[in-house]
Amino acid sequence: MKSSKKTLTNFWKDPSTGNLVSPSPSSINGGASSSGGGGSTISPTKLAKEGPVFGVPLNDIFKRNSTNVHNVPNVIWHISSNIRQSAMDVEGLFRIPGSNTTLQLLKKNYNEGKIGTKDDLNDKCDDIHTQASLLKLFIRELPDPLFTFSLYDSFIKSHGSKDKSIRVGSLKMLLGQLPIAHFSLLKFLAELLREVSTHSVNNRMTSTNLAIVFGPTVMRPQTEDIVKMIEDARHINGIFLLIIDEYEFLFNVMYINRNRNININIYLWKSKKNPKISFQFWNFLFFILVFFFEQPTFANNPSPNTSRNNLNSSVRQSPNKGFVSSNPNRKASKFEFSVVDDVENNSNDINNNIKLNTNNNNNSGKSQQQLLQQLQMQQLLSISPNSSVIGINQQNANNNSGNNNNNNNNNNSSNNQNKFSILLPVNNHPQPTLLAPSSPSSSIYGRNNSNGINNGATSPLPPASPRSSLTLLDMNHLNCGVNDYSGGYNNNINNSIGNNELIRGLIKKTCSILFDKELTSLTDGFEITKDETFIPAFDTSNINNHHSSPTSNSVNNNNSNNNNNNNNSSNNNNNTLNSDISQISPRFSRANEISSASNSSTSSPQLRSLLKSHVNNNLNNLNNLPNLLGNLQAQQQQQQQQQQQQQQQQQQQQQQQQQQQQQQQQQQLKNQSDENNNVTINNSNNNNNTPTSPVLNIINNAPITIPSSPPLNTVTSNLSPSTPYNESNNNNINNNNNNNNNNNNNNNNNNNNNNNNNINSNSNNNPLDIAFSHLEKVRKEGKRNSDINLMSIDELNEEKSAIKKELRDFDTNFKRQYGQLPRKNDKEIMRPLYIRYREVKSLIDLKSPQSVTSTLSNSSSLPSTPISLSSSNSLNKSQPSNNNNNNNNNNNNNNNANNTNTNNSNNNNNNNNNNNNNNINNNSNTANMSNSTSTLSSSGQHQLERANSSSSITSAAGIGGGSNSKSSTSPPNVVSPYISPSTSFNSLTELSNHQNNNNSNNNNNNNNNIDTSAPMIVDSHQYNSGNSNSNSNSNSNSNSSSKSSSPNITDFTKLSLNELKDRYIKVKGEKRSLQIDLHRYQSEFTKKHGRKVQFVEDRVPVQAEYEKYKELKIEIVALENILVLINNNHNHNHNHNHNHNNNNNNNNNNNNNNNNNHTTLYHL
């Protein structure tokens, strides 16, 4: 029975009632016009009666017959016709909005039926951008969008896969579930946008840009959740991008895009957990089987010798044959269903007739009989991934004792027979491999001569279609008869395979090929039994010499006389499978885009190859696969457990080694502390608020040096540049990230420096290790010292350039590997290198001639020789020595740790009271005791950043003791990055000493200046320690610190308080304006280049503004520090006058006021 073709033009199914509605003839011709299809012939009066167009469901518009012959609303057809006619090359099409007033007017005219043709539309508005905006407005105002609300979540989930073939196949399946009105309009819109994207050279609207514009318009969630819309935006744009790029495949059911990299495989995701998807799969399979119940018209000449010319003409004379796209005016190709002689080949390279008649005479006895039977069943049940269109009508096998004649005849059946067709994927190679037997035996595919040379070949698939089909006719009387009369043995096999068995076998093979799913059994109604299991395919990439030709791997259906052979072969194959099956699923290889030359198809070649090569002639052997999978999973779990155990053992060994090292180091420290018995500290009153660790011991005859902070995980230097001026024994402790303490005893004589480099190497070569190895190599080539303190300015500049180069190489390699520049978290591994870069840069600033000149000019008294703790002279030599030899000295050491305020009152009747308030905020991990020289180094010193000292040492640990003055022992020609001559000593003394000259009291004000990073504001923490004596009073007040590199500090101190405030407000305003300009430049740079300002070359256009901005920052910090100095000095004077009035009777007392003032500056 021949059925009429079902298209949108002759039937319509009402979604609400389910009834079929036949449209009127006027609706069919409504879109055509006498001028060539410009618009609809429906009168405006009729359109007005039909009602509005915008904001109306598409189903209602279609039922009202408000569509044209292309099954799209008239407003869409009018606008698309104008675009195709004259606006394909207009720049910014669909992106540039039109006039909103005109847009609303056009909407009103369409709703009132005043626009019936595209000429009417052009008369109302000829701006193509306004018309394009009207098209988007129509789609946007649909109550149910083109991608309906009910399928929104399914579309979003289908785009979550990383494999493009899975995304495209899933999208095609979901598009088939759209209502027919939505599907028709979406197809028309995708075709229009596809044509627009082909003119992207002129209109600048690529498929990606169009997807961004139309994605939110055609697809939106039912509840407008802003967060959900933002999260799903990339999926929405990606789905519509596939709609445009894969138009031919998605909207033409039997036509695939010519891009061979896209396959038709539709994989089931989460089938066990999602029964709906499983139902969709069977719905899709039913769509393939639906052609079995139809009877299309075939060629009139069924003979196997039909010529190609007759074939082409017969196909052209069959207008209703096969499947035709619903849009006849488009360029979609036809995909015909026919037998092998009716295949239309679009390739010009194939001009030969297909002849599948094979007559072979071989004297091979019973083995040929079995081989013939294998080949017959292979063609019935086994499907090769490279096969072209294959037609099988009848197979006859006759084996006689005298002459063995194997006649394989392929004949066309009559037109009234049913047909089952199935679509199969092929490989991505341009020329599929022909299916031919591997032995010189008889074959239905070609003619083999006596020498075993294959003379015949099947027709390969047309190059325009990367898909092949298998056509099997209804063979109710298919007989596979094999007669063997040799030796009195008569074996008659009459296998009658009906149509039902054939379809059942094809369904099983379809599942195994397309979906990696093997069905255990099917009922007569082709229903799936319950509790079916999914069997993943195997990866045979590691199996060697098991991929033979497609025809050599066969699946046989043997009779009862061959049961023993079947059992033996199955046992052997099981052993082979247990030894050769890989543990990696092919889904893993597909997800990671791993291709293999042995894989002839991307659907599931591994499973088919194993089944054909190992499971001999029996599909029931698939039942053994779950056991094999269980064994594989158990092996994987065992291997994982073994690996975890090995890792745990390695970690335990490492921890044990670290503990042993720590114990050894502690023992060494203990031994050294026992040897240093001559180290003593005379303290009559010890108020120790310092924690037990770290312990800091001070030696009277030891100069204190603070080297630069070594980079973490890198070479650490144990010597300071000041050590050549002292003959002593150095006991150094350096802490690296692996907690390895190396004690180096170095004997330093005059100018002998012993540098011990402790290299911390990691097991894996991370970028940091590679960078430091490169830097070490560059230093050796340039013959530079590894200690940056001993480098000259030129060497420091070279070191800075080398570090910068390594940092840029890290950024470049990161971008090459991950496709983007590293973020802040990604750069964390390179933090030690950044720290070293800042240290080198600070040394360059300190050692530059301009910086040295300014610092020397601002300092009043610099020691010409290094001053150690054993020196009895104070730093300020203009004053006489106030520390006479007294036999009774009370050293009040107040060690205040962790920012605690301690007030100690000690009533003493002696003449000389030395009150030393040591405020310790220690970030270091250890401090070593030694006889003569104590060198402090810690991994946390880089946080102090260029601390300065004028009369006392300021480092990670504040140190005080005795009547000995404390000073940095840096030589005059070498400047440390953390200890430099102070620029604010004179300004502070000028601000304080003019109120401290009362009677004969000698007040020595020692100010400790701590430098921190700028820009900063002031938050002063005062540490007060008052000592009330009957003969003397000493007060220690907290003062602020100033930055050594602040320019013109002494000039600022000459200004009045109001002038300083005005200057501060003015400079801050200038800095703010410059900051806005620089921020604007950064924003424009990011928009233009797609990245932030990162390199020096990027700042060239605003280099002057950038330098000015840095100067203003330094000036603001200096002004802030001066203002805080004045404020704190006012408090100091108030306290000093109060104490001075209480001590007028003590005119011959020597008061040493040691003011250790620490001010913590925080960032703005």
Swiss-Prot record:
Short name of one Pfam family: RhoGAP
Keywords: Coiled coil, GTPase activation, Membrane, Transmembrane, Transmembrane helix
One Gene Ontology cellular component annotation held by this UniProt entry: cytoplasm
Transmembrane annotation, as ranges: 279-299
Comp. bias regions, Polar residues: 1-21, 444-456, 698-728, 979-995
Site description Arginine finger, residues in chain: 95
Gene3D superfamilies linked to this entry: Rho GTPase activation protein
Low complexity bias: start-end ranges: 22-32, 393-418, 545-579, 676-697, 729-766, 853-939, 964-976, 996-1009, 1024-1048, 1140-1158
InterPro entries per record: FAM13, Rho_GTPase_activation_prot, RhoGAP_dom
Coiled coil: 627-685, 1057-1130
Domain Rho-GAP span(s) in chain numbering: 56-251
Single GO biological process annotation from the record: small GTPase-mediated signal transduction
Protein's cellular compartments: Membrane
Location of the region described as Disordered in the Swiss-Prot/TrEMBL record: 1-46, 302-329, 348-371, 391-468, 545-581, 666-768, 849-1050, 1130-1164
Entry keyword Membrane: yes
Topology within the bilayer: Single-pass membrane protein
Function: Rho GTPase-activating protein involved in the signal transduction pathway.
Official protein name in the record: Rho GTPase-activating protein gacU
